[in-house]
Amino acid sequence: MSNMDPNSVLPKRSFLQHELFSQLHIPGSLAFEAFSCISKFTGALLCWFSHGNLQKEVSKHQWGLTCKSRDSLKHVFEHRNVSVFPFHYVSKDISPGFFGNISKSTIQHFVNEAERLHSCSLLSLAAAMIPSLNVMSANGLALPLGSNDVKLRENIEHRTCPENTEHRTCQVGCEEYSGLSFQKLDWTRQSVEPRTGIEFPMLLKENASRSNSEVLVATGSRTMKIIRIKSLKVYAFGFYVHPSSVCQKLGRKYASVPASKLDKCDDLYKDLLREDIVMSVRLVVNYNGLKINTVRDVFEKSLRARLVKANPKTDFNCLNDFGSFFRQDIPIPAGTIIDFRRTEDGQLITEIGGNLIGAVRSKDLCRAFFGMYIGDVPVSEQTKEEIGRKVVGIIKRC
């Protein structure tokens, strides 16, 4: 029994992960000792209840025992099946006191064993039930360690931030943004857009601190259908906002509003567009056959419709200037990075492959462009909601 393999007792993927076994194992097999104690105690009780009949049988032969009488006595004990009990009867006079002493001794031994086992504290038991750090999954931690995916999960429960706490925490996406965890977040890691597998940096500016760079709040992708059969993943995009700009423009207005009410608040998205908050969209081309003039035509068509809806008397010169940046001689193979950035003074700056290709000063054009992602009929409704949740988390930390 002492050589029994622990794996045969506890499954390899059991809840305790062998920790409880390794912490509470005592040589000699506790199960066997407990069974032995119970067996002795039961035997003593049975002997006590049967001692009256045994004494009567013995008293008939206790005077002048002959060989024959001794054989009869042996027959009596064999008939009573006394040999099954772990006691040896060596006394001629078997009295109630004899069995009483045995029972008392057995009970005392059983109590002592129970007290000895009780010395294993509940604290040790609790410690044994907690898995070791090396077998804990990253999902069980407050912040993901080394995880590349910071996309939201639809089934995550959103909690309202308690008021007047030192480190307020909001569940935004799959990360908890609190005063402590946000500071320790690994901003050097990449976030992966799941459909295309394209990576986006958490900070838009390389080698920049969180205080002077836009941070990633959502990723998404644009898909086009070809002949209603094949879906073409044209590009992936990452949406960035500047936390300081968000706090400065929206912090006071929404600080007292519960996060649960801001989750799908249309006014929040309208204010993000109206208040000239610093934000950027990074596009990464995912299709080798994409042409620069195709990108220009798609943007001009969408922007024109949004400008007309916002203000029918809009000056479209800003749109013409924007379209002129996309010249025929600019190659955009798969992997090309195109950045669009809005500044506080209302400029829309365009960069391709890290090179500045132009800037247009027009607040209407900026609002129309970023309205494609957080306005009416966005590129991705799911990404828009994710942006809203992450911005709410930033506001609650202002």
UniProtKB/Swiss-Prot annotation:
Domain of life: Eukaryota
Compartments, as annotated in UniProt: Plastid, Chloroplast stroma
Disruption phenotype: No visible phenotype during vegetative growth.
Keywords: Chloroplast, Plastid
Residues at which dodecanoate binds: R222, Y235, S302
Cited Gene3D superfamilies: 1.10.890.20, 3.50.70.10
Family that this chain belongs to: Belongs to the chalcone isomerase family.
Name of the protein this chain belongs to: Fatty-acid-binding protein 2
